[in-house]
Protein backbone atom coordinates (compact mmCIF):
# COMPACT_ATOMS: atom_id res chain seq x y z
CA UNK A 1 0.00 0.00 0.00
CA UNK A 2 2.82 2.35 0.85
CA UNK A 3 4.36 1.83 -2.61
CA UNK A 4 1.02 2.56 -4.24
CA UNK A 5 0.80 5.90 -2.39
CA UNK A 6 4.33 6.80 -3.43
CA UNK A 7 3.59 5.95 -7.07
CA UNK A 8 0.34 7.95 -6.97
CA UNK A 9 2.18 10.94 -5.51
CA UNK A 10 4.73 10.83 -8.34
CA UNK A 11 2.03 10.47 -10.99
CA UNK A 12 -0.54 12.99 -9.76
CA UNK A 13 1.80 15.55 -8.17
CA UNK A 14 3.18 16.80 -11.51
CA UNK A 15 -0.30 16.75 -13.09
CA UNK A 16 -1.62 18.96 -10.30
CA UNK A 17 1.38 21.30 -10.67
CA UNK A 18 0.78 21.55 -14.44
CA UNK A 19 -2.87 22.47 -13.78
CA UNK A 20 -1.84 25.24 -11.38
CA UNK A 21 0.71 26.61 -13.87
CA UNK A 22 -1.83 26.44 -16.71
CA UNK A 23 -4.42 28.23 -14.59
CA UNK A 24 -1.94 30.96 -13.61
CA UNK A 25 -0.87 31.38 -17.25
CA UNK A 26 -4.49 31.64 -18.40
CA UNK A 27 -5.27 34.19 -15.67
CA UNK A 28 -2.32 36.40 -16.63
CA UNK A 29 -3.12 36.06 -20.34
CA UNK A 30 -6.73 37.12 -19.75
CA UNK A 31 -5.68 39.97 -17.44
CA UNK A 32 -3.18 41.60 -19.81
CA UNK A 33 -4.61 40.74 -23.24
CA UNK A 34 -8.14 41.86 -22.32
CA UNK A 35 -6.82 45.42 -21.97
CA UNK A 36 -3.90 45.71 -24.41
CA UNK A 37 -5.38 43.78 -27.36
CA UNK A 38 -6.06 46.16 -30.25
CA UNK A 39 -4.54 48.98 -32.26
CA UNK A 40 -2.89 51.82 -30.34
CA UNK A 41 -1.34 55.16 -31.24
CA UNK A 42 1.75 55.89 -29.14
CA UNK A 43 2.76 59.57 -28.92
CA UNK A 44 6.17 60.64 -27.65
CA UNK A 45 7.70 64.08 -28.17
CA UNK A 46 5.15 64.93 -30.88
CA UNK A 47 5.79 61.77 -32.92
CA UNK A 48 2.98 59.23 -33.32
CA UNK A 49 3.50 55.53 -33.95
CA UNK A 50 0.84 52.87 -34.50
CA UNK A 51 1.35 49.67 -32.52
CA UNK A 52 -1.00 46.72 -32.93
CA UNK A 53 -1.36 44.05 -30.26
CA UNK A 54 -3.06 40.85 -31.25
CA UNK A 55 -4.12 38.36 -28.59
CA UNK A 56 -3.44 34.76 -29.56
CA UNK A 57 -4.47 31.63 -27.66
CA UNK A 58 -1.67 31.79 -25.08
CA UNK A 59 0.37 34.88 -25.91
CA UNK A 60 0.10 38.43 -27.24
CA UNK A 61 1.93 39.65 -30.35
CA UNK A 62 2.61 43.39 -30.71
CA UNK A 63 4.04 44.94 -33.86
CA UNK A 64 4.73 48.36 -35.29
CA UNK A 65 6.77 50.37 -37.77
CA UNK A 66 5.60 48.16 -40.66
CA UNK A 67 6.72 44.96 -38.94
CA UNK A 68 10.11 46.39 -37.94
CA UNK A 69 9.18 46.18 -34.24
CA UNK A 70 7.90 42.91 -32.83
CA UNK A 71 7.19 41.82 -29.26
CA UNK A 72 5.87 38.54 -27.97
CA UNK A 73 4.27 38.59 -24.52
CA UNK A 74 3.33 35.48 -22.61
CA UNK A 75 3.57 33.54 -19.38
CA UNK A 76 7.11 32.79 -18.19
CA UNK A 77 6.81 29.66 -16.01
CA UNK A 78 10.30 30.14 -14.53
CA UNK A 79 9.59 33.67 -13.30
CA UNK A 80 5.87 32.95 -12.82
CA UNK A 81 5.13 36.28 -14.48
CA UNK A 82 3.88 37.88 -17.68
CA UNK A 83 6.98 38.61 -19.78
CA UNK A 84 7.77 40.12 -23.15
CA UNK A 85 10.65 39.74 -25.57
CA UNK A 86 11.12 42.04 -28.51
CA UNK A 87 13.26 43.31 -31.30
CA UNK A 88 13.16 46.63 -33.10
CA UNK A 89 15.73 48.27 -35.32
CA UNK A 90 19.09 47.04 -34.03
CA UNK A 91 18.03 46.46 -30.41
CA UNK A 92 16.72 43.46 -28.49
CA UNK A 93 14.88 43.64 -25.16
CA UNK A 94 12.98 41.74 -22.52
CA UNK A 95 10.42 42.86 -19.92
CA UNK A 96 8.97 41.14 -16.89
CA UNK A 97 5.72 42.51 -15.45
CA UNK A 98 4.93 42.77 -11.78
CA UNK A 99 2.22 40.58 -10.28
CA UNK A 100 -1.17 41.92 -11.20
CA UNK A 101 -3.64 43.11 -8.62
CA UNK A 102 -7.39 42.82 -9.01
CA UNK A 103 -9.51 41.19 -11.67
CA UNK A 104 -9.02 43.65 -14.53
CA UNK A 105 -6.92 46.52 -15.76
CA UNK A 106 -8.97 49.69 -15.32
CA UNK A 107 -8.62 53.42 -14.68
CA UNK A 108 -6.27 54.22 -11.82
CA UNK A 109 -4.33 50.94 -12.00
CA UNK A 110 -0.53 51.18 -12.16
CA UNK A 111 1.54 48.41 -13.72
CA UNK A 112 5.30 48.12 -13.70
CA UNK A 113 7.88 46.23 -15.72
CA UNK A 114 11.58 45.68 -15.25
CA UNK A 115 13.77 44.72 -18.15
CA UNK A 116 16.94 44.84 -20.13
CA UNK A 117 17.83 46.32 -23.50
CA UNK A 118 20.79 45.12 -25.56
CA UNK A 119 22.53 47.26 -28.18
CA UNK A 120 24.45 45.70 -31.12
CA UNK A 121 27.79 46.61 -29.52
CA UNK A 122 26.89 44.43 -26.52
CA UNK A 123 25.96 47.30 -24.23
CA UNK A 124 23.32 46.22 -21.74
CA UNK A 125 20.88 48.76 -20.33
CA UNK A 126 18.65 48.09 -17.32
CA UNK A 127 15.17 49.56 -17.65
CA UNK A 128 11.99 49.95 -15.70
CA UNK A 129 8.58 51.16 -16.79
CA UNK A 130 5.51 52.45 -15.02
CA UNK A 131 2.19 52.19 -16.85
CA UNK A 132 -0.58 54.44 -15.56
CA UNK A 133 -4.00 53.41 -16.85
CA UNK A 134 -6.13 56.48 -17.53
CA UNK A 135 -9.26 54.74 -18.84
CA UNK A 136 -10.33 51.84 -21.09
CA UNK A 137 -8.76 53.51 -24.11
CA UNK A 138 -5.65 55.32 -22.90
CA UNK A 139 -2.57 54.94 -20.73
CA UNK A 140 0.82 56.56 -20.12
CA UNK A 141 4.23 54.92 -19.89
CA UNK A 142 7.22 56.38 -18.05
CA UNK A 143 10.55 54.64 -18.71
CA UNK A 144 13.84 54.89 -16.83
CA UNK A 145 17.10 53.48 -18.23
CA UNK A 146 20.49 53.01 -16.61
CA UNK A 147 23.78 51.63 -17.88
CA UNK A 148 26.25 50.21 -15.40
CA UNK A 149 27.98 52.96 -13.47
CA UNK A 150 26.01 55.78 -15.07
CA UNK A 151 23.16 57.98 -13.90
CA UNK A 152 19.59 56.95 -14.51
CA UNK A 153 17.99 58.54 -17.59
CA UNK A 154 14.28 59.37 -17.62
CA UNK A 155 12.85 58.90 -21.11
CA UNK A 156 10.13 61.27 -22.38
CA UNK A 157 6.61 60.23 -21.37
CA UNK A 158 4.69 58.07 -23.86
CA UNK A 159 0.93 58.53 -24.17
CA UNK A 160 -1.08 55.78 -25.82
CA UNK A 161 -4.65 55.88 -27.06
CA UNK A 162 -6.69 53.10 -28.58
CA UNK A 163 -7.69 53.47 -32.24
CA UNK A 164 -11.47 53.26 -32.36
What are the functions of these language-model segments?
Residues 4-11:
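Sec-dependent N-terminal signal peptides
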Residues 20-22:
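Boundary at the C-terminal end of the N-terminal hydrophobic targeting segment
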Residues 24-39:
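N-terminal helix-cap/turn-to-beta initiation motif at the start of protein domains
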Residues 42, 58-64, 80-86, 110-113, ...:
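Short hydrophobic/aromatic-rich beta-strand segments that constitute the beta-sheet cores
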Residues 48-53, 70-74, 94-103, 126-133, ...:
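Hydrophobic/aromatic beta-strand elements that line small-molecule binding cavities or substrate pockets
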Residues 68-122:
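Contiguous, well-ordered beta-strand patches that form the walls/edges
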Residues 121, 135-137:
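Residue-level recognition of beta-strand termini and adjacent short loop/turns
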Residues 138-164:
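Edge beta-strand at a domain terminus
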